[in-house]
Amino acid sequence: MLLYNITIGIDKEIEAEWLQWMKDQYIPVIMQTGMFVDWKIYKVLHDQDDSSVSYSVQYFSETIEKVVQFVEQIEPELNKQHQKKYKDRHVAFRTLLEEV
């Protein structure tokens, strides 16, 4: 099992709206691609500052090929949508992990 993790720092002023949008719109679109079998979202409890909060959005896949296909063919357009909606109010980094 592979875990594609996206850690996102989001402006606290829009945290609730962003989280709802992720759960209601963004993540369902990703899951409909069939590239992932499950997802989870966690709030990061350490290293917080006064202006932002971080979340770990985790997508689980059975094969590296599906993750690569998602990253190369699907994610760029989704990133554009996220960037358009939240502009300079977020930062993100991605990590791919393999269960051992």
Residue ranges and their predicted role:
Residues E15-I41, E77-K80:
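Short amphipathic alpha-helical segments
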Residues Q25, Q73-I74, K85:
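Alpha-helix boundary/capping residues
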